[in-house]
Swiss-Prot record:
GO biological process, one term: ribosomal small subunit assembly
Cross-link Glycyl lysine isopeptide (Lys-Gly) (interchain with G-Cter in SUMO2): where in chain: K89
Name of the gene this protein is made from: RPSA
UniProt [DE]-W-[ST] repeat ranges: 230-232, 247-249, 266-268, 275-277, 293-295
SUPFAM superfamilies: Ribosomal protein S2
InterPro entries with a match to the protein in the record: Ribosomal_uS2 (IPR001865), Ribosomal_uS2_C (IPR032281), Ribosomal_uS2_CS (IPR018130), Ribosomal_uS2_euk (IPR027498), Ribosomal_uS2_euk/arc (IPR005707), Ribosomal_uS2_flav_dom_sf (IPR023591), Ribosomal_uS2_vert (IPR027504)
Protein name per UniProt: Small ribosomal subunit protein uS2
Subunit structure: Monomer (37LRP) and homodimer (67LR). Component of the small ribosomal subunit. Mature ribosomes consist of a small (40S) and a large (60S) subunit. The 40S subunit contains about 33 different proteins and 1 molecule of RNA (18S). The 60S subunit contains about 49 different proteins and 3 molecules of RNA (28S, 5.8S and 5S). Interacts with RPS21. Interacts with several laminins including at least LAMB1. Interacts with MDK. The mature dimeric form interacts with PPP1R16B (via its fourth ankyrin repeat). Interacts with PPP1CA only in the presence of PPP1R16B.
Length: 295
């Protein structure tokens, strides 16, 4: 699918991202049309998706999106919470039209409806959850692209990208990869340099988890303030007035203290000392004498 071009081959960092997000992990059920995308089956019954096929279908989907002259004619849809943020980010990056949340029936078929639109390409996150837009796309002859798991039905799906469309990280990473490939094929960003947008921006975050993190951060800040207030002593207040010096060259006047004078002695006038070499010899003889008396 990549045409044997090294530029379009899957890089090692892309494989690591897929493995870290769990994109290769499918479900325990398998649709007969998804058998061609399966690599192996684990002992616990979970099917492993072939990431090489995932990358090839990702490039094919990016080529189909780039082929649309007006980016606004591409509709990206996600009715599940895990893909709504990714859909909005993808639309902001590529210029597509997002539909995050509930899809109003008749959007593609009912011309009287205020939300009626006629896109040229449809991209959905889950064929099972987004069955209504897929069904309406079949009525108006609209080509469709879908992120498909091992148990996803491929009815009315023209380009199926095999991946894990249940996990929040996997769905966000797939939309990030698709947006990056679209921008690369359009020439907006270079393949030689990494894209400055991180995949984390496409990940879904539960509002309850965000509130818990904010509360934990606030409690931590309050505890830190209380801890500092208990153990830090107040700074002493200096009320004594400092002497005002108008001219710093003069400085503060220091009273002079007289230095006490001591008499000096002339050492040369003293008599010469006796011979110190004779005294130890005499003492030594006396000690010898005493020793002989004891013996």
């Amino acid at each position: 699918m990549s045409g044997a071009l090294d530029v379009l081959q899957m890089k090692e960092e892309d494989v690591l991202k897929f493995l870290a997000a769990g994109t290769h992990l499918g479900g325990t059920n398998l649709d007969f049309q998804m058998e061609q995308y399966i690599y192996k089956r684990k002992s616990d019954g979970i099917y492993i998706i072939n990431l090489k096929r995932t990358w090839e279908k990702l490039l094919l989907a990016a080529r189909a999106i780039v082929a649309i002259e007006n980016p606004a004619d591409v509709s990206v849809i996600s009715s599940r919470n895990t893909g709504q943020r990714a859909v909005l980010k993808f639309a902001a990056a590529t210029g597509a039209t997002p539909i995050a949340g509930r899809f109003t029936p008749g959007t593609f078929t009912n011309q009287i409806q205020a939300a009626f639109r006629e896109p040229r390409l449809l991209v959905v996150t889950d064929p099972r959850a987004d069955h209504q837009p897929l069904t309406e796309a079949s009525y108006v002859n609209l080509p469709t692209i879908a992120l498909c798991n091992t148990d996803s039905p491929l009815r009315y799906v023209d380009i199926a990208i095999p991946c894990n469309n249940k996990g929040a990280h996997s769905v966000g990473l797939m939309w990030w990869m698709l947006a990056r490939e679209v921008l690369r094929m359009r020439g907006t960003i270079s393949r030689e340099h990494p894209w400055e947008v991180m995949p984390d921006l496409y990940f879904y975050r539960d509002p309850e988890e965000i509130e818990k993190e904010e509360q934990a951060a606030a409690e931590k800040a309050v505890t830190k303030e209380e801890f500092q207030g208990e153990w830090t002593a107040p700074a002493p207040e200096f009320t004594a007035t400092q002497p005002e010096v108008a001219d710093w060259s003069e400085g503060v006047q220091v009273p002079s203290v007289p230095i006490q004078q001591f008499p000096t002695e002339d050492w040369s006038a003293q008599p010469a000392t006796e011979d110190w070499s004779a005294a130890p010899t005499a003492q030594a003889t006396e000690w010898v004498g005493t020793t002989t008396e004891w013996s």
